[in-house]
């Protein structure tokens, strides 16, 4: 590749990346500048944006997280000025990244398209919608099931020793966002397995042959991401991932069988 061609590709990549950054920044700024005001419309509650940087949507999300996730008896506090603000910035940025993810995927696919085979492009299109759905499912599972249980479990350990718990807002938000991202990404596992098999990088039996190493890696990941050493909470991470691995193995093998049948 000549220096001129490389420069053209770099400029194209910069333009596409800039679009993603602009959308992410716009969504982040919107959440920090507007308040979601409820209103009644034909008997249903709807929300519309109202300029209010103090009681913004990021603050509303933070308050909802506090009410839904913080165990009863635990106080959410800030220990230095500005912690609550930066917690809201983190939340707004995560929402911005999430909203811009489909755009990022589209821009990346458009950039790589000239170098991809038609079969690889088809695989990418077929997994785009399921990827978004699985990411949302992973975040929902983490928010509804995993995070409340882990926080309550760890709080009760302290309570049994007569310890009063005060939870720093930055630590709380970082903890929640860590789990949301970890589960959103880990729920992509079956799609990654399917795509790798469909693109011909490995055969369908590869996942079954290496299952012991995969399970060991999943358990280590579960132990690493959970904050305690009890060996209990890690299974809330490892358990679903093991199920997802088996699901990915099933779909990868089924696709390979279909291709062999079609080629016979």
From Swiss-Prot:
- A single GO molecular function term of this UniProt record: proton motive force dependent protein transmembrane transporter activity
Q: Which Pfam families match?
A: TatC
Q: Tell me how this protein sits in the membrane.
A: Multi-pass membrane protein
**InterPro entries in UniProt:** TatC
Cytoplasm is among the record's keywords: no
Q: Where in the cell is it found?
A: Cell membrane
A single GO CC term for this protein reads: TAT protein transport complex
One GO biological-process annotation of the entry reads: intracellular protein transmembrane transport
TM regions (residue ranges): 20-40, 85-105, 131-151, 175-195, 211-231, 232-252
Alphabetically ordered keywords of this record? Cell membrane, Membrane, Protein transport, Translocation, Transmembrane, Transmembrane helix, Transport
Describe the function of this protein: Part of the twin-arginine translocation (Tat) system that transports large folded proteins containing a characteristic twin-arginine motif in their signal peptide across membranes.
- NCBIfam families under this entry? tatC
Member of which family? Answer: Belongs to the TatC family.
Know the name of this protein? Answer: Sec-independent protein translocase protein TatC
Originating organism = Cenarchaeum symbiosum (strain A)
Lineage here is: Archaea, Nitrososphaerota, Candidatus Cenarchaeales, Candidatus Cenarchaeaceae, Candidatus Cenarchaeum
